[in-house]
Structures are given as structure tokens and as C-alpha cells.
Amino acid sequence: MSISTKTRNTSSINLIRESARDFALQYIKPYVMDWDENQHFPKEVLQKAGEYGFMGILVPEEYGGSGLGYHEYVAIIDEISRVDPSIGLSIAAHNSLCTNHIYKFGSNDHHKKYLKLLATGKMIGAWALTEPNTGSDSGKMASTAVKKGNKWVLNGTKNFITHGK
């Protein structure tokens, strides 16, 4: 069944949207200017988002996630971004670029080790694509990952790492 013909429960999506709006108004809006002026990255609000299920939107419940779909994902990110686009982007990057990649492409061991921590906001996911000489052109990346025994050795340089220090 294609997405265009799949029936969605719009009343449940509206409830999720309302929950995200309430979250943003209570935990983000009062602090936005202070965070911006002081260049503060509010890890505490991302942890609170985890309590609301917003850090594991697409992760199945068996791994501590919300087990929701992309329609709910869009509604949550939309409402949070209306109050603070940077927090919306952080939650979207965490869910899509890190957590969802581990869920879709990680091993069972990766699922067990990382997904619950990520889905609950106890761990914040990062993303490292950009390299100094190639920008974000993934086809020209120079970094490598080579398996040595039962471990992987990473070689290369990254910059502009989303959620990196």
C-alpha cells in the first residue's frame, strides 16, 4: 500500500501535535532568548524531550522508543520548530541522522546497546558527514572504516559535526 493511499488516524496525530506544542511552550519558549544570547546548547531540554518520547519517535517500543511513524514525526518536529527551529532541528537530526540509522542498519548488539539510551534522551546522537576537503559530498569522502579482527578502525577527519563537541 502506498503512503498516498494509506489511511492515517488524524485525531491521534492531532493529539501528538498538541502534546508537542504543549512541550515546546512549557520547556522551550521561556528560555529561547537566553539560550540564544548565551550560546547555550540545552541538553536538559533534549532529555526532557526523551521523557515525552520525542527522542525515539521512529524507534519501536521494544527498544524504548515511541514506535510512531513519519506523519507523527513531522507533526512533532513542526510544532517544536514553530517555537525554536534549532531545537526542532536537533531533535530531527537525533531521530533521523543517528537513531534511525542505527535502528535500520545497526546490528542487534547496536540496537541493544544504543537505542534505549538514544530513544529516552539519555544519550544524544551525533552525525559526522562533512570533511575539510570535500564538504558534505558523501561520494568524495576520504575517511575510511576498516575491519581489524572484531573491531573497526576509523581513519579520517570530520568537521561541523552535528551535536559534536
Which residues fall in each region the model found?
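N-terminal glycine-rich flavin-associated loop
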Residues: 88-109, 135-138
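Short alpha-helix boundary/capping motifs
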Residues: 52, 77, 104-108, 130, ...
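Amphipathic, small/basic residue-rich leader segments at the start of a protein or domain
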Residues: 1-92, 109-113, 117-120, 124, ...
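Surface-exposed beta-strand edges and their flanking turn/coil or helix-capping segments
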Residues: 61, 70, 102-104, 139-142
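Glycine-rich, Trp-frequent "lid" loop and neighboring beta-strands that shape
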Residues: 65-66, 109-165
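Conserved short loop/turn motifs at secondary-structure junctions
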Residues: 34-38, 61-65, 98-104, 130-133
